[in-house]
Structures are given as structure tokens and as C-alpha cells.
Amino acid sequence: MSQPLTTRPTVTGISIIPFRQPPPLCSFLFVIVLFVATFYTLHHPDAVTPPLLFSRNAYNALRLRRLFLSSASNATISSYLRELTRHPHLAGTKPSLDTLHYVFNHFQSLGLETHVAEYEALLSYPTHISVTASFSNTTTLEFDLNDVPGDSPVVRPYHAYSPSGSAQGNVVFVNHGEERDYHALESIGVSVKGCVVLARKGENLGRGAIVKIAEAKGALGVLIYAENDGGGFGGIERGTVMRGIGDPVSPGWPGVVGGEKLSLDDELVTRRFPKIPSLPLSLRNAEIILASLGGARAPLEWRNSGRVGPGQRVGPGRMVINMTFQGEMKMKKINNVVVTIRGSEEADRYVILGNHRDAWTYGAVDPNSGTSALLDISRRFALLLKSGWRPRRTILLCSWDAEEFGMIGSTEWIEENVLNLGASAVAYLNVDCAVQGSGFFAGATPQLDGLLVDVLKLVQDPDAVGLTVEETFKSQNNIIQRLSRVDSDFSGFLHHAGIPSIDMYYGADYPVYHTAFDSYDWMIHNADPLFHRHVAMAGIWGLLGILLADEPLIPFDYISYADQLQAHRDKLSKLLEGKVSVNPLSMAIQEFSLVAKEAADEAKKLKGKSYSKNDVAAAAKRRELNDRLMLVERGFLDAEGIKGKEWFKHLVYGPAAEPESKLGFFPGIADAIAMNASEGIIEHEIWRVARAIQRASKALKGGFT
């Protein structure tokens, strides 16, 4: 039963009376009382003993970090996750409101300033799904499309925003469903026109792109399976096939309650949805279909990857598939929870930590491993506040809704606040699946690389005694990825608003992704039995927030960014083989490099100045430099956006409109190359990126021409 969004009653403090040379029994009782008091304090920061006098100096900064790290509690995080995963909580459903209340009440119980930002969005749910196979001997087979018992509260596997309808035809196996896979089929005389295609999900294409390409090739319907088999349980991977992100009936503006909504037949809306039905399948069912296929043998490269056998045929075969999806699209209320921890000196500058709350099923990994870490960070921040700390800059803790449908909650919030974000957001720190296995992974915009590595040096590795996360990261992975992908809530912040961003997670992948088996039970038996990885992630995430909020000078390194731009330019030049000049890029990057070094020198000088509030001149210089450091990323935005995906404005990191792009950066240039555009068009895209880099240089340098 849902609880009202009210503040929980606070509890009075506990005092411990000191004593000398107690007898053994008293000593034992004292230890017990101390343990209980410590446990109580961690869970009820209102009861912390009188606050420390907090002043901003190196010693107190160190004490603050130590207090934050030492107040970690794996048992507490475990209890949060257990509560969050008691029931499925798909966005727009009643159980999702229970999860909303739990998160909201948790924040309020800590005494944190908390509010709900409500929106209205078009969501998609299944009403009927079926897949049957007919054979030439009149045998019929109906596939089981559920990965849980019939009376389970978990939503049946489906693709959100698939159109309702049926498709009947022979089956053709299309590998990962990429353009090159269809080219391979064409080379052996196989067409998918009038057929149902079977695709295995790969790394390069999302579900929506797989369906879009199949539709363009003349397929009637699409079945998609994942080779991980749901951890051996027969799990089926749910997901969305909507194109783009955000509420489809309020494209480009916030979906506020009572605001403008387009009709479902508006062209701006219909182009977001596929025109042919699609459904997810289990690996078990996919293998039945694969075994029935005749026709030509699959290309060698298909048979050398994944679980495709050496004798695999691509079809068509003697099996005819009849697939049906019936669904309904409904306007639903979605709710973001936002905590505000006001800054003491630069309250108008914001460091944002975010995680989504909604899940396809129970969501133990995706996303509530991240949610439980965020709840623990809030508990520890409340403890710091009781000790006398206040951040220099304002910190926001955000719990997003409806991410699984296409990052809807965060996108609507960004669209409503885009001007304020552009003027005052320092950074966005995203954690979606905090823990899905072993090993630390991260993606970031390059100016945050150095800060991230510094923080990793402060956190103990959960899997290697005596080592820091930085030491194991350096030996096992040591790659900070770039954020051109669109698969979590950082996308709108970086690609649309130009906010420096980080995305982090433990574990490269996990087998129960988006299945009914993503549960608390799976977490404690597989990914993190003792919740030590959760503790490490919460430590990294929270310390990043503290340092970005507290450091007098924002810890951004644009020399690192310049080096990365140069590496991107070199790779592009090699790809173009001299056919198109990259000189505009070279000149722009050279200028950016010089300005980055000047800014680094300026920061070095200012670090030697007094941090006293009374030193007005030094404070003004720091503020002016901080503003320039903060605004650089906005320079990479272009009002026209990426051709074909105009909502995405970032010209250095953003999603390429063409899935076959050979670059993970410069999306406009990458698309032009992938589409075999003329040299003039490619050159124009190069100039667009060069101008964006020049804008970033101007922002970092300050002043006017």
C-alpha cells in the first residue's frame, strides 16, 4: 500500500557516558551499546553528536572525505535494494508509485529538501502477444513467450512502442540486423521482402535500429533474441523500439501536465515508431527456429561468432511464422524525485547525481543497484551536513522515472530546465546499473578523466585486498570510454544541454538483463553477495560529487580534452586517406590546445591565492575562471544538431544517425562518410565541428573578439 509523501518522525539522539576501568561484563556491554549506537547513527543522521566547526581547508577536506568513506554500510545498501525490488515497478503502473513513495520518504526522513517533478508522457503496454510456427506437414507449434508463471505480476516480454498487428511469412536469419548483414544476404541471393526476420541482438544496434533497417528492407515483422539466455533460466529481454528519446507526443518541449501534446497521427509522432511489429524471443525459442531454416549457409563470419553453429542456414525454410502483437499506448503520469543540497558560497552552480528508478521487472541490477547506492549517498551526505558541512556549490540528487521507455523522465526535466542548466550546471554524474558483475567501467567527457582517476585512488577495491580501484582499473581495463552512445540518462545532459558527464558501472555485462530474473536473489547469488561493489560505487560516485561541489576551482582538465580531440582528428584523417582536408579541424584544435594550457596556468596561479571569503579579488577571479571552465562543453553544441537526429546538438560526442558509422565521435562527419556523401558535404561537416571547437576555445578564453 502506498504511503503519503510525508516526512517521517525524527528520533532523539543517544548519549554515551564515559567511564574508567570497568569490569569485564561492563566492557562487553559497552561494546554492544557502542555497536548499536554506531549502527543507529549511520541510519539516523539526525542523532549525530554536536556538529564540527567546518571551515574550508585541506585538513577538513581530508576529514570530510574520510568521514564520507568510513560511513559506508553494505548492510544498509542491501536493505535498500531488498525493499526496492519487492515487486516489479514498470513506469506508469501502480507498483511504480510505491517505489516513488519509498524513495521520496527516504530522502525526506534524512531532513533533505525534496520535491517531485511530475510530467505526463505517452507510454506503451502489451495486451496480447503470440508467436506460432506452422510446418509443411500441418504441424503447429505455439511458442511460450513468458519467462515467468502466468500469475506473475511481471509484465510479459514485449517491445514498447511496437505497432499493433500481425505478420506471417517465412523466416530469414539476419544475424545482428545491420546493413552489412543484409548486404551479405544479398550477395548469396537471399531477400527478406515479405518475410519475418530473426535477429540476434549485438553490440552495435539497439532494438529500434534493428527494426528500422528490417522495415526498410521489406520485412513484415521482426523477432529479436539475446544470446545470453537470461542466465540459463530462459529469460526474455524486454526493451523499447522507439526512435529518439523523451516523450514522443511532446518532442522538443517538456511534457508538463496540462501542456501541449501532439496527436498520435502527427508526423512528428508517427516517425518515432516502427511500422512493422516486433517481439523479443528467448534463446531457446530462437534456436528452434534456427534449426528449421533451410537455404544457403550463413556467412562464415556469422558462424564464427556467438552461438551460431557451423552448419547454420539463413532460410527461408519449411517453417512459417505467424506473430501478433496487440498493445495500447496511454498517457501516464511520471515522477522524478529531486533533492537539493544548497551550496554555501556558489548556490547558483549545480552538481547533479542521477539514476533512474523504473524497471522492466524487479530491477535489482537495472537500475536499482544504482538507486540503492544513491540512497546510501544521500544518507552519508545527511551525516556530513549534521557534522557541519555544506557544499560550496549546490548538489542535486535525482531519481528519474520512465528511463526504460526512452530516457523520458530525465529528458522532460532537461527540456523544462535547459536554459538554467546551460547557465549553471557544472557536471552530471550518472549511474544506471551500479553493479552487474566485476571490474570497474566508466565513460566520461575528457575534462573529467583526471578527476575520476584521482577519486579511484581514494576508494578501496572491493575484490582485491590492499589495492585501490585505480590500481585494478589500470591493470585490467584502463580505458575511459567516450559518451556517444544513447543508453542512459546522461544522454540528454551531454548531447542536448552540453553538460560535462560521467557514466559508471561495475561489470561489463550480465545475463539477466531486462528479464524477469533481474532480482535481489540473483544479485546476492551472482553479482555482489556482500554488497562490497555497491559500497565502492557509492564511494566513487559520492566523492566525485563532493569534489566537484567543494573544490574552489572546478577540477576540469582541458589539456586532456585537447589531446583527445587531436587523437580523434588523427583517426579521421587516416579514415579519409587525404581525400578531404582536415586542416580546419587541425587549426581549431591547435587553438583549443593553447587556450587549455593558458587556463591551466591561470588555475595554477589562483590555487596559490588565499581561499578566504574576505579575499574578494581572488574569489572574483576564481568565479570568473570557474564560469569559463563550466561553459566550454556548451561550445560543442550546434543549434542545427545532427542531421537526421536534430535534438542531439553535440558535434563531438553524440549518436550517429547511421548505425554503420566507423567513428565513435564527430557524429555529423561520421554520418556523411557512412552515407558515401560528396566531398563537399563531408567538408561542410568538418567545418561545423571546427567552428564548434572554436566556440569552446572562446568560452575557455573569455572576453570578446
From Swiss-Prot:
It is a single-pass type II membrane protein. Binds 2 Zn(2+) ions per subunit. It comes from the Eukaryota. Residues 43-705 are extracellular. Zn(2+) 1 binds at residues 356, 366, 432. Its cofactor is Zn(2+). Expressed in all plant parts. Highest levels in the bolt stem, inflorescence, root and silique. Low level in leaves. Coiled coil: none annotated. Residues 1-24 are cytoplasmic. The keyword Membrane applies. It is found in: Endoplasmic reticulum membrane. Zn(2+) 2 binds at residues 366, 404, 514. GO terms for molecular function: metal ion binding; metallocarboxypeptidase activity. Its EC number is 3.4.17.21. It is an enzyme of class 3 (hydrolase). Residues 255-548 are annotated as: Catalytic. The keyword Magnesium does not apply. One of its GO terms (cellular component) is endoplasmic reticulum membrane. Induction: Down-regulated by abscisic acid (ABA). May modulate the level of one or more small signaling molecules that have a role in regulating meristem function. May play a role in balancing and restricting the meristem-promoting activity of auxin signaling. Involved in ethylene and giberellin (GA) signaling pathways or in a parallel pathway controlling cell and hypocotyl elongation and cellular organization. Involved in abscisic acid (ABA) signaling pathway. Plays a negative role in ABA-mediated seed germination and seedling development. This is Probable glutamate carboxypeptidase AMP1. The gene is AMP1.
